[in-house]
């Protein structure tokens, strides 16, 4: 750590903290960026001590500069950091990383005076046509075309692509890029370099034979040709089995009616490679679904990888992208994606689902679940008003019932303390709405006004009609008793006569005579 801190000291370290990472950004360089750059130098076999001087930084830049155009983000960040350190050692005032890069490229270009130290964006690139110096067919100064064999580097890249991807969806565009401008002879060399996967090679050979037969059927032989005239290619000529390299070049670049046999052969092989891709990748795009804990970005990568292997119309692929991508997402991401509206872009979907399925969302879901589990259910207002504190009838304490009480059992009634009855039948129970009940006592829940002693009530006297009515009622009761009495006595005497006893009254026969009913005139 001490050696890394010695890269910049004193004033240079203060100047480093004033340089911005981006022209319009707020973040600035810190010593941790120097430590990171020292760690990255080990990956390129460069010593950390080179950062301590201007010449050492210049050597690092010489090594990294050719790799910047095709390098990764870490490589570009390392190049930018070394540019800033070079400016500090050279005592050049810069405000941000872009100024440091321009200053370094200008100084290095002035010192070397070659195009190798020019800015990466201004370097000449290879021509896009098939006539560059890296392609098999090249044109000489006299206008003639010559054949240059494929370099071992190209063949090695093709073999490594097949071995690493194992006929994945990347093999087809890889073959298309490596075989650009090649003749059928060169393409056969590439196919012969594949040692393994002979089943896939046999599928490609069958596709080539079928396409060659179709070519022969569509292009019949016109007839005998004059001597010295180049014949038209047959299917086997396009496949490179019955033609030479010189004939293939002449067919490709003749002025009249050229036949691009190389591109035709490439197209046949691409059809075979696409069938091999479907065979080695049987996963259907309809089966690509996002897992419950899978990040949305990983699911999108798998989806587009399977979509790339699908050999369908672009309109069908567009429909799959708009429909299946959202339909096969997990419920969490699907809920977020439906809130984006109709036909959201892929950038909007990736941004919206960036945190779904991550540790942050898992923590929030767990916190919500725990909150719901630990929160007691709400008590209704009426139940809360009616809720009372439980009191024990045995010991008189609150918080438990008599059944749960641990104190000794109390004898007698728990209400009044007397023996002989239980609390449910206690005569001293609490008065109801109408009083204490039918026990011969006056109700004690109504206030009674006590008249002070020495005062005479001033209420009016009773109504005389009430007394008169009571007297009439009493007389009526007496008359009814008198009318019922003779019949009762006669009935009792007859019962005594039947039993052979003497009657209680001597006038029984008189009472039984009709004179008792109709008088003495009968």
UniProtKB/Swiss-Prot annotation:
Pfam families: Gag_p17, Gag_p24, Gag_p24_C, zf-CCHC. Residues 7-31 are annotated as: Interaction with Gp41. Residues 280-366 are annotated as: Dimerization/Multimerization of capsid protein p24. GO terms for molecular function: RNA binding; structural molecule activity; zinc ion binding. A lipid is attached at residue 2 (N-myristoyl glycine). It comes from the Viruses. A motif (Nuclear localization signal) lies at residues 26-32. PROSITE patterns: ZF_CCHC. Residues 14-33 are annotated as: Interaction with membrane phosphatidylinositol 4,5-bisphosphate and RNA. A zinc finger (CCHC-type) spans 390-407, 411-428. GO terms for cellular component: host cell nucleus; host cell plasma membrane; host multivesicular body; membrane; viral nucleocapsid; virion membrane. Gag-Pol polyprotein: Specific enzymatic cleavages by the viral protease yield mature proteins. The modification Phosphoserine is found at residue 151. A motif (Nuclear export signal) lies at residues 16-22. The record marks 135-136, 366-367, 383-384, 432-433, 446-447 as: Cleavage. Keywords: AIDS, Capsid protein, Host cell membrane, Host cytoplasm, Host endosome, Host membrane, Host nucleus, Host-virus interaction, Lipoprotein, Membrane, Metal-binding, Myristate, Phosphoprotein, Repeat, RNA-binding, Viral budding, Viral budding via the host ESCRT complexes, Viral nucleoprotein, Viral release from host cell, Virion, Zinc, Zinc-finger. Residues 8-43 are annotated as: Interaction with host CALM1. SUPFAM superfamilies: Retroviral matrix proteins, Retrovirus capsid dimerization domain-like, Retrovirus capsid protein, N-terminal core domain, Retrovirus zinc finger-like domains. A motif (PTAP/PSAP motif) lies at residues 457-460. Residues 108-146 are annotated as: Disordered. Late-budding domains (L domains) are short sequence motifs essential for viral particle budding. They recruit proteins of the host ESCRT machinery (Endosomal Sorting Complex Required for Transport) or ESCRT-associated proteins. p6-gag contains one L domains: a PTAP/PSAP motif, which interacts with the UEV domain of TSG101. This is Gag polyprotein. The lineage of its organism: Viruses, Riboviria, Pararnavirae, Artverviricota, Revtraviricetes.
């Amino acid at each position: 750590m001490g050696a890394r801190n010695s890269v910049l000291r004193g004033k240079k370290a203060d100047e480093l903290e004033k340089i911005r990472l981006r022209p319009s950004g707020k973040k600035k360089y810190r010593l941790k960026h120097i430590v990171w750059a020292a760690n990255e130098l080990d990956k390129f076999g460069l010593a950390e001590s080179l950062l301590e001087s201007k010449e050492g930084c210049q050597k690092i830049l010489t090594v990294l500069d050719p790799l910047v155009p095709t390098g990764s983000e870490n490589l570009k960040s390392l190049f930018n950091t070394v540019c800033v350190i070079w400016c500090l050692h050279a005592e050049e005032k810069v405000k941000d990383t872009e100024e440091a890069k321009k200053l370094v490229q200008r100084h290095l270009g002035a010192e070397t005076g070659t195009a190798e130290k020019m800015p990466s964006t201004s370097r000449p690139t290879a021509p896009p046509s098939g006539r560059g110096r890296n392609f098999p067919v090249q044109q000489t100064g006299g206008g003639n075309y010559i054949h240059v064999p494929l370099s071992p580097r190209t063949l090695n890249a093709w073999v490594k692509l097949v071995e690493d991807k194992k006929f994945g969806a990347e093999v087809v565009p890889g073959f298309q890029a490596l075989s650009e401008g090649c003749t059928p002879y060169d393409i056969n060399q590439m196919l012969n370099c594949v040692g393994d996967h002979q089943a896939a090679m046999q599928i490609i050979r069958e596709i080539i034979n079928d396409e060659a037969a179709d070519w022969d059927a569509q292009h019949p032989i016109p007839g005998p040709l004059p001597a010295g005239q180049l014949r038209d290619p047959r299917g086997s000529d396009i496949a490179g089995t019955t033609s030479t390299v010189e004939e293939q070049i002449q067919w490709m670049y003749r002025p009249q009616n050229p036949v691009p046999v190389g591109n035709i052969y490439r197209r046949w092989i691409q059809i075979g490679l696409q069938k091999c891709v479907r065979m080695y990748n049987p996963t259907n795009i309809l089966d690509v679904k996002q897992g419950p804990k899978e990040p949305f970005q990983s699911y999108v990568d798998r989806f587009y990888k399977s979509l790339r292997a699908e050999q369908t119309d672009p309109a069908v692929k567009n429909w799959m992208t708009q429909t299946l991508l959202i339909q096969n997402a997990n419920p969490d991401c699907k809920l977020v994606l439906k809130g984006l509206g109709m036909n959201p872009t892929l950038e909007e979907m990736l941004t919206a689902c960036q945190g779904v399925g991550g540790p942050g969302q898992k923590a929030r879901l767990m916190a919500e679940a725990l909150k719901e589990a630990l929160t007691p259910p709400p008590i209704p207002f009426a139940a809360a008003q009616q809720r009372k504190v439980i009191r024990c009838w045995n010991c008189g304490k609150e918080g438990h019932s008599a059944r749960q009480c641990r104190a000794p059992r109390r004898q007698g009634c728990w209400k009044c303390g007397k023996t002989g009855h239980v609390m449910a039948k206690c005569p001293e129970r609490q008065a109801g709405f109408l009083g204490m009940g039918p026990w011969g006592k006056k109700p004690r829940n109504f206030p009674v006004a006590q008249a002070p002693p020495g005062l005479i009530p001033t209420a009016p006297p009773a109504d005389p009609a009430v007394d008169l009515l009571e007297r009439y009622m009493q007389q009526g009761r007496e008359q009814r008793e008198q009318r019922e009495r003779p019949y009762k006595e006669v009935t009792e005497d007859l019962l005594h006569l039947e039993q052979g006893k003497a009657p209680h009254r001597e006038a029984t026969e008189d009472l039984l005579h009709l004179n008792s009913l109709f008088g003495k005139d009968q």
